[in-house]
């Protein structure tokens, strides 16, 4: 089933045009962000707005139909961050330089790992390079996001 235009608009505005996983700005992207099914349709998820999140193409692709990830510290299977039920700043902070997302809870760490939000395993660090440019342009990170203290 396809998400209708009104729902797509609601999801984009509700997210303040940020990827709800990595907080990249849609306006700084070469492609419109995807409407992500938090509980994937393949696992019975619906098109209800409470099951939808705005996701950049990277996060949407890496998340695929996964709902769990591995906490790299404990090796436990942990539910991924749920944008409708959890607050981003409770699970993630930006590094002091604003280039890397740091998971501060098992959920945050498992999500960072599953979605490879800092390109530690893919793309030769291209997202960190992009964030550096966005930082220079004053577009990143979002002002309301917490940052690691020096």
What are the roles of these predicted feature ranges?
Residues 38, 43, 72-74:
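Short edge-strand/loop segments of extracellular domains
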């Amino acid at each position: 089933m396809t998400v209708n235009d009104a729902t797509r608009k609601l999801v984009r505005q509700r997210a303040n045009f940020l990827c709800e996983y990595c907080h990249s700005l849609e306006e700084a992207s070469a492609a419109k962000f995807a409407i992500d099914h938090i509980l994937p349709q393949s696992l019975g998820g619906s098109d209800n707005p409470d099951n939808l999140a705005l996701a950049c193409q990277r996060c949407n692709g890496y998340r695929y139909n996964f709902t769990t990830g591995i906490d790299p510290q404990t090796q436990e299977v942990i539910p991924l961050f749920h944008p409708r039920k959890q607050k981003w700043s409770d699970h993630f902070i930006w590094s002091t330089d604003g280039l890397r997302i740091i998971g501060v809870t098992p959920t945050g760490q498992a999500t960072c790992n599953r979605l490879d939000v800092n390109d530690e395993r893919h793309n030769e660090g291209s997202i960190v390079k992009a964030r550096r440019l966005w930082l220079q342009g004053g577009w990143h990170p979002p002002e309301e996001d917490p940052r690691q203290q020096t």
